[in-house]
């Protein structure tokens, strides 16, 4: 068998079975939810998170007319370091968000499972409490309340 291996028409690599199964599941979920409902859930989730971030006292980096629904960029509070805030979020709350190249901002991805209500509450709470741990004066409760009030636009989109 070894002598004829290279001459045969066999595919001699392992197929990416986990990737194929993951793609199948992702497409199944999209078909089940439908694209219009998925897009609307992402839009509502992003607007709600943006409102919560601003209500707690943080400033968003991008002007409202230019914002995307897929990522939220947050200005790092004065006299703090985004890497330190992100480290606290990771270590204390098991929440990962991104920094940026060249700018001291924090970015929260707003796609897929992040646009589920329980994940929105978790990331906003982790962000607020991590900033407070670094001495930033924020009203985390007000931010959480604003997030919640923006999510009730249509609860159907946010079923977990």
Give the positions of each predicted feature.
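Generic secondary-structure signature for well-ordered alpha-helical cores
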Residues: 25-36, 47, 51-58, 77, ...
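Flexible, glycine/charged-enriched surface loops at secondary-structure junctions
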Residues: 34-41, 57-64, 98-102, 134-145
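Active-site C-terminal subdomain of aminotransferase-like
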Residues: 1-55, 159-160
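A generic structural motif
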Residues: 70-74, 104-109
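PLP-dependent enzyme catalytic core of the Aspartate aminotransferase-like
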Residues: 106-160
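Conserved PLP cofactor-binding pocket of PLP-dependent enzymes
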Residues: 92-107
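Short amphipathic alpha-helices in soluble, non-transmembrane regions
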Residues: 83-92, 122-127
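Conserved PLP-binding catalytic core of the aspartate aminotransferase-like
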Residues: 59-89
């Amino acid at each position: 068998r070894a002598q004829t291996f290279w001459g045969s028409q066999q595919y001699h690599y392992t197929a990416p079975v986990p990737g194929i199964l993951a793609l199948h599941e992702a497409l199944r979920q999209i078909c089940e939810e439908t694209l219009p409902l998925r897009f609307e859930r992402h839009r509502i989730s992003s607007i709600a998170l943006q409102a919560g971030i601003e209500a707690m006292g943080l400033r968003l980096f991008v002007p409202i007319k230019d914002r995307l629904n897929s990522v939220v960029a947050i200005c790092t509070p004065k006299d703090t370091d985004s890497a330190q805030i992100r480290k606290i979020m990771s270590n204390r709350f098991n929440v990962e968000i991104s920094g940026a190249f060249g700018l001291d901002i924090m970015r929260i991805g707003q796609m897929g499972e992040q646009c589920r209500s329980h994940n929105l509450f978790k990331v906003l709470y982790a962000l607020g409490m991590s900033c407070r741990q670094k001495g930033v004066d924020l009203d985390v409760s007000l931010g959480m309340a604003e997030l919640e009030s923006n999510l009730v636009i249509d609860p159907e989109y946010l079923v977990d």
